[in-house]
């Protein structure tokens, strides 16, 4: 069998296959015999239809189409084996099937073109001695104080306020309704859907609801009704309301202040369900946790910007079949996260939405797959090995989590890949020159750049 290979983009190989004349004749004869045995035609017993009657009744094109379906599939498999091609997934027929039917003649050579996905290719250009910036998170004692204050607020007693006006930090119980303000500055008659509530509890704090809404309550007294206008942000989730002026009519029905519990051992015990008996022990644990969080945040930042450098300096060609598998993995992970949050995934992952969700997940899937392939290739080149004790420990943890119903061989491979990538990232960090900047610096620069592009 004559086969011409052509390298195609997206990790594909193009094949032009010429099927010998004797093979096309045999395929035709085999198909006609098969149809004669299986086709039901009026006036004939099954399996007893004469060849010419069969061709006449079914039509030559229908028979040739049936021949070509098997011929293309069999010839492609033979060509892949002959050329030692490591094909992934199904093939794509590049020739027009209708043209092949028209050109096909039993006993004459027949040619067609197809493409198959092959394993991804990785081109390593530069990965040692990378230079980049990353954000360094530092433990700030103020974070501990803020956490404890928030816990005090959560366990605070709400005390009715009657002798003063509302101020920031209070809790307002109110009725409200919103109406659009037209270009003439007049309030429209209809209430906007979703902007009406009764006995709504609102914390009078900065950042609650939309800008200006909380401020409108400051200075009000219980039983007072007031109108004020706010402008919804341009990036508000409801596009119909984004950037619009809305007049709110609010009635403050109750006003409450928070009476914070004392910051003492009793409070620590209550806030932690008796996990800690003393405030000092709880503070020590919280401090250690916050310090660990800062280290993890720093490490995540280093790896994020390291991966960006690897992606910029090295390249991959990804087969579509692998990308689709990774898209499925991304969506499966999202479904599990939503499920853990108590969200009904069936309302999000509907039949109509899945194609859109898959397209949205594609960039992340391609980046994840590319990163993994680059790191795996670096590990091979640099002969990076994983720690056996760490592998065994992680394997036992995974078995305990899964308990039963898992393929141990696949589990071992997954853990080995995970630890290899982790070890490779650690090795690359040691090889890199990293300039640390305060946390939030780079993200602020990126946000500013993104706004500039808009």
Curated annotation (Swiss-Prot):
Q: State one Pfam family annotation.
A: Trigger_C
User: Where found, per UniProt?
Assistant: Cytoplasm
Q: Which UniProt keywords are present, listed alphabetically?
A: Cell cycle, Cell division, Chaperone, Cytoplasm, Isomerase, Rotamase
Gene Ontology biological process terms from the UniProt entry: 'de novo' cotranslational protein folding; cell division; chaperone-mediated protein folding; protein transport; protein unfolding
Using the UniProt record, name the top-level EC class of this enzyme in a single word: isomerase
Kindly give the PROSITE patterns that the UniProt entry links to this protein.
Answer: FKBP_PPIASE
Provide the PPIase FKBP-type domain boundaries.
169-261
Look up the EC number in the record and give it.
5.2.1.8
State the reactions this protein catalyses: [protein]-peptidylproline (omega=180) = [protein]-peptidylproline (omega=0)
User: What does UniProt give as GO cellular component?
Assistant: cytoplasm
Q: Does the keyword Magnesium apply?
A: no
Stored SUPFAM superfamilies: FKBP-like, Triger factor/SurA peptide-binding domain-like, Trigger factor ribosome-binding domain
Q: Which GO terms describe its molecular function?
A: peptidyl-prolyl cis-trans isomerase activity; protein folding chaperone; ribosome binding
Top-rank lineage group of the source organism: Bacteria
Q: Which family does it belong to?
A: Belongs to the FKBP-type PPIase family. Tig subfamily.
UniProt remark on domains: Consists of 3 domains; the N-terminus binds the ribosome, the middle domain has PPIase activity, while the C-terminus has intrinsic chaperone activity on its own.
Which NCBIfam families does this chain map to? Answer: tig
Q: What does this protein do?
A: Involved in protein export. Acts as a chaperone by maintaining the newly synthesized protein in an open conformation. Functions as a peptidyl-prolyl cis-trans isomerase.
Protein name, as recorded: Trigger factor
């Amino acid at each position: 069998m004559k086969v011409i290979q052509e390298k195609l983009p997206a990790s594909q190989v193009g094949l032009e296959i010429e099927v010998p004349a004797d093979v096309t004749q045999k395929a035709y004869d085999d198909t006609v015999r098969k149809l004669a045995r299986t086709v039901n035609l009026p006036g004939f017993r099954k399996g007893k239809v004469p060849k010419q009657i069969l061709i006449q009744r079914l039509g030559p094109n229908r028979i040739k189409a049936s021949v070509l379906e098997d011929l293309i599939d069999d010839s492609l498999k033979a060509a892949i084996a002959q050329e030692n091609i490591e094909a992934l997934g199904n093939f794509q027929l590049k020739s027009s099937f209708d043209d092949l039917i028209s050109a096909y003649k039993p006993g004459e050579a027949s040619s067609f073109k197809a493409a198959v996905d092959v394993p991804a290719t990785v081109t390593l250009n530069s990965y040692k001695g990378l230079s980049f910036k990353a954000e360094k998170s530092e433990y700030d004692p103020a974070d501990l104080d803020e956490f404890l204050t928030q816990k005090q607020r959560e366990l605070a007693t709400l005390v009715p306020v009657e002798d003063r006006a509302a101020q920031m930090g209070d809790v307002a119980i109110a009725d409200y309704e919103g109406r659009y303000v037209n270009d003439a500055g007049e309030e429209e008659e209809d209430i906007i859907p979703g902007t009406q509530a009764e006995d709504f509890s609102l914390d009078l704090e900065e950042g609650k609801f939309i800008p200006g809404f909380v401020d409108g309550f400051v200075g009000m007294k219980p039983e007072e009704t007031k109108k004020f206008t706010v402008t919804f942000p341009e990036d508000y989730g409801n596009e119909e309301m984004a950037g619009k002026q809305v007049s709110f009519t609010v009635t403050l029905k109750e006003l409450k202040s928070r009476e914070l519990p004392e910051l003492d051992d009793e409070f620590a015990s209550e806030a932690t369900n008796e996990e800690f008996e003393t405030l000092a022990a709880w503070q020590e644990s919280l401090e250690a946790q916050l310090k660990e969080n800062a280290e993890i945040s720093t490490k995540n930042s280093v790896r994020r910007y390291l991966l960006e450098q690897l992606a910029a300096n090295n390249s991959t060609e990804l087969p579509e079949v692998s990308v689709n598998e990774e898209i499925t993995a991304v969506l499966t992970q999202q479904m599990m996260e939503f499920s853990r949050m108590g969200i009904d995934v069936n309302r999000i992952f509907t039949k109509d939405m899945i194609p859109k969700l898959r397209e949205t997940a594609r960039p992340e899937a391609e980046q994840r797959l590319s990163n993994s392939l680059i790191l795996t290739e670096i590990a091979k080149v640099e002969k990076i090995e994983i720690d056996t004790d760490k592998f065994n420990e992680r394997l036992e943890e995974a078995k305990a989590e899964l308990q039963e119903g898992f393929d141990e061989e696949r589990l071992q491979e997954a853990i080995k890949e995970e630890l290899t990538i982790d070890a490779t990232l650690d090795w690359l960090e040691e090889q890199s020159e990293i300039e640390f900047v305060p946390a939030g610096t780079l993200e602020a620069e990126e946000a500013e750049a993104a706004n500039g592009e808009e």
